Amino acid sequence: MEPDNTPSSRLRAAGVGGRAVFFCMVLYCTCCLRLAQAQSADVDVLQRLGLVGKRPPQGFIPIKSGVILTTRARIDVPVSSVIPVSLGSTFSIILSVCSHRINNAFLFTIVTKRKRLHLGVQFIPGQILVYLGQNSSVNFDYNVHNGQWHNLALEIQGQKVTLYTSCGNTSIQANLDFQNEETLDSEGSFRLGKMSQNSVQFEGAICQFDIHPSAQAAHNYCKYIKKQCREADTYRPNLPPLLPLLPLDPNRSTIQTPKVVTDINERHLSLTRDKMNINHEGQTTVPPMITQPTLQLPLQTTAQTTASIRNRTSQISPKPTQQNRKKAKKERNKLHILKEHQISVTDSPTSQQQNQVDIPTTTTPELSSTFRVSEMTTLAAQRPLPKETSFFEAKATFFESVTPAAMDGLQTFDLEPTQYSLLELTGLKGEPGLPGPPGPPGQPGLPGKRGPRGPSGPHGKPGPPGTPGPKGKKGNPGISPGRAPSGIKGDPGLVGLPGQPGQPGRKGQKGHPGPSGHPGDQGIRGPDGSPGAKGYPGRQGLPGPIGNMGPKGVRGFIGIPGIFGLPGADGERGLPGVPGKKGKMGRPGFPGDFGERGPPGPDGNPGEIGAPGPVGIPGFIGDMGPVGMVGPPGLIGPKGVPGNPGEPGLKGDKGELGLPGEPGEPGFQGDKGIQGSPGLPGVQGKPGPQGKIGDRGPDGLPGPLGPEGFPGDIGPPGQNGVEGPKGNAGVRGIPGPGGLPGLEGDQGPVGPAGAPGLEGRPGRKGISGNPGEEGMKGEPGMTGNPGMLGERGPVGFVGPFGEMGLAGEKGDRGETGQPGPPGEKGAMGHPGAPGERGLSGPAGAPGPHGSRGLSGTRGPKGTRGARGPDGPVGEKGMMGMKGPEGPPGKQGLSGQMGKIGETGEAGPTGFTGVQGPTGPPGAKGILGEPGPQGSPGVLGPLGEIGAIGLPGKAGDQGLPGEPGEKGAVGSPGNIGEQGLIGPRGDPGVDGEAGPSGPDGAKGEQGDVGLEGESGEKGVIGFKGTEGRTGDPGLIGVKGPEGKPGKIGERGKPGEKGSKGHQGQLGEMGALGEQGDTGFIGPKGSRGTTGFMGAPGKMGQQGEPGLVGYEGHQGPQGSLGSPGPKGEKGEQGDDGKVEGPPGPSGDIGPVGNRGDRGEPGDPGYPGLEGVQGERGKEGAPGVPGNSGPRGFPGPKGSKGNKGPKGKNSPRGESGNRGSPGPVGVPGPRGVIGREGFEGEPGLDGAAGKDGAKGMPGDLGRDGDVGLPGKPGPQGNAGAPGLPGVQGSFGPKGERGITGHSGPPGKRGLNGGMGFPGKQGDQGFKGQPGDAGEQGFPGVLGIFGPQGPPGDFGPVGIQGPKGPQGLMGMQGAIGPVGIIGPSGNPGPQGDKGNKGEMGVQGPRGPPGPRGPPGPPGLPAVAFSHENEALGAALHVFDSRSALRSEMYQDTDLPLLDQGSEIFKTLHYLSILIHSIKNPLGTQENPARMCRDLLECEHRLNDGTYWIDPNLGCSSDNIEVTCSFTSGGQTCLKPVTASKLEIGVSLIQMNFIHLLSSEAVQIITVHCLNVSVWASEDSKTPSSSMVYFKAWDGQIIEAGGFIEPDLLKDECWITDGRWHQTQFIFRTQDPNLLPIVEIYNLPSTKPGSHYHLEVGPVCFL
């Protein structure tokens, strides 16, 4: 035998060893290939979508830890480009996300080509919803919307869905009762961040989004979390104060031990469909303790533990302690998550025996290993830890050990010392194990990529095929290249025999994309995204303990709209309230004309800090450390995160005048300045154009109690009161006047036999008749004479009624009987036909002189009186002195009466209340005593006409009763049926003349009669005697408007009474109707001249009177002395409107009477003259006969303007006119738009130093140690993550001014810092020195109207300015609200007598003008066209000026430039109103959400919308719920019907503009079931089902099911119950519900009725 060391034996040994090595290599390569294939099958969704590059699509912002989705993010790609179609029903989804906005958005959805949902994950507040198909979903109680990073995994394995958190330690499982057999549609679409185009967008950051085809990946998903996602994880605890981030020390070991969680809150699951029963279970898995001697730790175990670092050896125990329980419970209540703690220690050569941590094992104690940990040499050496702190929390970042575990003895490697990135512990070198038996070949794997050419092996004999072995567990992922340890170099193998060339292998399939590469460098910051859509409001949570005031919360979840409540009862009138605070600024009105630029205002306070920018990634909050020695300057680090804003500095010195800047943004309105001292009178400016009517000022203090007000409007009729007891008989009333003759009654029964009549006179003897023929045989003879009167017999029985006898002849008219008892009041008869007007009665005798009556209301316009005689020539007055300048006048008189406002629309009808159960009948009460006579009730509603009763039997003739007293007035009976029109009655007897009635209402204007002949001059009457002075009467309450009385005769004029005392001002009575014209009485004698009366209030402008007769020409007055020259008056308004009549000129001398001229041709009728002064009352003329109505004459042309007359003397003050009627308040003006912001005020002066703050609480940290020596210069550190903005420290005391440093170089422009917190408002600084005159800036946008300033002292009256140019005619403004009447002003001094004017000659009548052009048709402007119509009105006024052909050349031309500018201004307002609707019927919005986005301070209520923005005739009145995110709610026509009064087109637009809808339908039932049966409590066969708007059927167990809020109708206990159905869907086309089927049939004792709630769209 050859020895073993021979070459052949060595060759055999080498061959055996080489085959073993080759087998191991093949096995290792196979494992690696399997691992690579498994990893290659994983899908990195972000990489597939192209979101991890330097330039992501629009709407995505790249960050170091992933990508941020904004509202502009749009990802909708085919599924095949993201997920392999071969993905089965078992896979895992690993997510690392952070939500920035609370809403109900989907993270992703996979939709089939038929737009059906296949797979989707939705984050709602407090829950995660996973959709598997269109109708199946499951939700987990897990809150993602808390602003922190969340690492989680979802395992989907057939019918089972499991949510893993805490690195797999916590899982919640849900099972579905059906198998989702739908496969992935290759033609479907993948959407990221939303479900559909109209749904809400997910706003937040995504660091990792991977899909693994294996369900095992979710069990320990932390192994697959990327590095940058771990660093961004905010579940890890923050660093303690005064400890910065630890550097990545290669000598540091990071240990993490699991903690047994003893109590975990049960996770609740719920399904949205009733047919899915889910078995949920809460389980907690704890990874096993470490058993390998190489200290292989789990990657990231999110359990919780507490360890202590002591000076002695300490053992980390996995058992829970009391401290652990308390802290775990606290953290669970706070965040509902499990946090991680770890211990970080470093090796040090100083002490290697002091600290040692033993890691015990759980299964193999003999393999436990020990490693040593030394004291920390980091910052803890410079500053000791607090005594109470036994550990500190550091960033929980873990990496897997790079030492692979031994593979159950099948393979052995010589191990080098283990290399760690953070775990640098060298394991023991293992002994080589025995070679194990070859395993069976595994299942064929996927064809891999073509590998490098391997060495040629020996040709072995083909072995028998083995049975396929079981699938091995997935191995741990390999270590990244460069970090893996190099294996022990093996012995060189022998050179193998050259193998035969193998057949070329088949071409491998294209592999899946490889794993994602290392994260790239920080990309360029993309543009800021558009603001995101408003999220759905969250559901209301359970009330927690009262915490500190938090930040402004997000909008709440869409609530169920409540039932509209009934209006409450009217409350009692409260006491007058305290004057309220100044109200908020009203909406600005229409813009006024542009005024001149005012002087610059004082420096304003600093404005508010702007809104904060987008929230950055939260960093770790570090506190300020102790000040150390100044070290050498380090390298320039990267640009840091902008710091917090500093304290505002002191106001600097005034700089030099700079160049004019760009026009600034409108600033906020400055505070009201301090009242300045009165300045000198300025130069009189040009009068500006007339301004708009200003906003109503603040309400003044309550004035004294006014006079008694007018009676209020008649209120609505109250409910019928309880019938009161019968009242006592009233006093017999005065017999009323005789009524009209009634209809002829039916023939009455035969009356009793009348008394025998008086014996008549004997008749005349008749004429002898002819002898008669022989008569027939006579009848038996008549009964003989009665015998003697016998005794009275007994009363016999009542005999039967005899037959009705024949009607006898009409008897003579009997005497008038006694008045019978008053009969019952008959039914209200129908009003009779109006009677004809009676003749005027004869003139009555003149009555006695009456006392002076109260001041009557203003009568109608009288007819033109006859021309009176010439008055005497007045004496020449003395020249008056020029009076002193009067004080400024008080508030002017009230304006003209406003237009009558339109009647408001009826309010919405409230929902019908639920009918209460009928109560049991009460016990009969004791008969009460008759109560006092009640006040007459309100007229009750008319009852229905009763059916005609059967005729009763005729009673016996009653005895005539005694005349009864007059009964009380009965309640009005029901309206009887229409009776036949009776015959016209006889004319009544002329009654006596009644008293004079009040003035009747003004009648319509009658036809113009022919001009009567001039009457003869009446005789001058005698002067009456003066009456006595009457007492002033009290102010009477306004009585009801009386009916016009009969026309009384005109009484003789009474004697003139003496002047009475001035009575109190009576209230304005209602305008009476115009009565008929009375007879003209004789003219009274001229009375004596009364005293000068007090000036009365300004009366309303009377109607133009009839043109009076031309007066006689008076004598020529003497020429008065010229008065002082008056000041030149201001130019008046445009003369298009008739001006007030000028004073009458002096009467000229009477000329000689000329010869009678020839009658001239009839002149053209002139224009209607200006209302002349009322002439003296002429003598009454004889009334002429009414002539036929003449044809209207043609309108004459306007005559030439006559010469200007001389100023006549000022007439005496007229008598005090009666106050005009109070006008009806006009319609409320349209609320104007919110004005633009004003220009920013100047910076205010620096505030004074604040007071020294209170000393803070003593911190738990120890004293600060002595500063250490300066350390060596460190290398430039990597830029850290941006930290969360720290809390503002207390304001320090003002330091002493330091020495001025050397001037530094000009630095680079710094980045935009975060906006600082708004500082306390400083005291108002002293006004600064006036600056130099700057260049005129660009005209800014008009700011809102400021608050009214305090009234300053009256300044010195300035000189009168020059006459201004005529202003343009402004646009017609809205009718203002009629203001209260002002107090009458004091009586002014008598004015100076004017200069005598020269009387001008009377001009001839002008020629007749041509007929005018036809007028334009009327145009009904809507609200949107008001401004445009006003602009057109401005231009039409210019054309009117040209058409009327004024000859006055003094009128200035209109400024076309300013007119065009004003038109453009109106057009801009019009466009603004279209873009920003008000929600009124004239200016509707498309949806309520538009109003919410345009106006942020609207209240919930009724608004108008027009979804199709078409004609205003189909506008919809809706209820807007802005507190629910801008819901648009459509109410049904009635609360018990499903009909909604919206057209089909408008409803289609509402569906297009909405993304979700909700509606509630309630069925009120009594002993009847509509859903569940009483036995099974499950939907019965007789349940109702619904028809949606698009025709789909909604029923239990169907494709779409209704949700139940309450189902109590199965209870049949004789009481009313209800079942509430809620329909909430993200397909708005389903609502509203249009029909309900299978409603139950009611039986005796069972009822139901519907209550249909509004349908709300969002």
UniProtKB/Swiss-Prot annotation:
Chain residues in the propeptide: 1421-1658
Polar residues compositional bias, start-end: 308-323
Major subcellular location class: secreted
GO biological processes: bone mineralization; notochord morphogenesis; skeletal system development
InterPro entries: Collagen, Collagen_superfamily, ConA-like_dom_sf, Fib_collagen_C, TSPN-like_N
SMART domains the UniProt entry points to: COLFI (SM00038), TSPN (SM00210)
Subcellular location(s) per record: Secreted, Extracellular space, Extracellular matrix
PROSITE patterns the record matches: NC1_FIB
Protein name per UniProt: Collagen alpha-1(XXVII) chain B
Species in which this protein is naturally found: Danio rerio (Zebrafish)
